[in-house]
Amino acid sequence: MSKPRQSTLDPEDKKYLEIPDSEVVLPAAVDSYLRQKLKDQSLKECSSHVAAFADCSKDKYISVVWECRELQQLMKNCLVEYTTSERLIGMKREWVDASKKRIYEKRLQKELESKEPTPKK
């Protein structure tokens, strides 16, 4: 197993944020993952509302429409509150910033390696 990579970056160093966003590509798989993560977080935050609606609708078919309407609306309002585009944008921003940090660390590492003297034979 490989060891976890040690960061060569000072935790206070925020120069990596100077890397333009255009150098970081958000792959479709990451976008999909972040959307799923947002959905999972929202369901966790609204678990009491989701459970209440699920309990109400257990033994009902068509009557669920009018018998569980209030619980469904509470669940929907909660999910809408937590599943916002602002939260998704924030998650994407965190991912982009983490990518910038990795890019910056790689550049620093290359600079350090290029400055090291080569051993003479």
Swiss-Prot record:
Ranges spanned by the short sequence motif Cx9C motif 2, renumbered to the chain: 68-78
Entry GO CC: mitochondrion
Disulfide bonds: 46-78, 56-68
InterPro entries: Cyt_c_biogenesis_Cmc1-like (IPR013892)
Residue intervals of the CHCH domain: 43-86
Name of a matching Pfam family: Cmc1
Alphabetic keyword roster: Disulfide bond
Motif mapping: Cx9C motif 1: 46-56
Signal peptide boundaries: none
Family, per entry: Belongs to the CMC family.
Record protein name field: Uncharacterized protein DDB_G0275933
Species of provenance: Dictyostelium discoideum (Social amoeba)
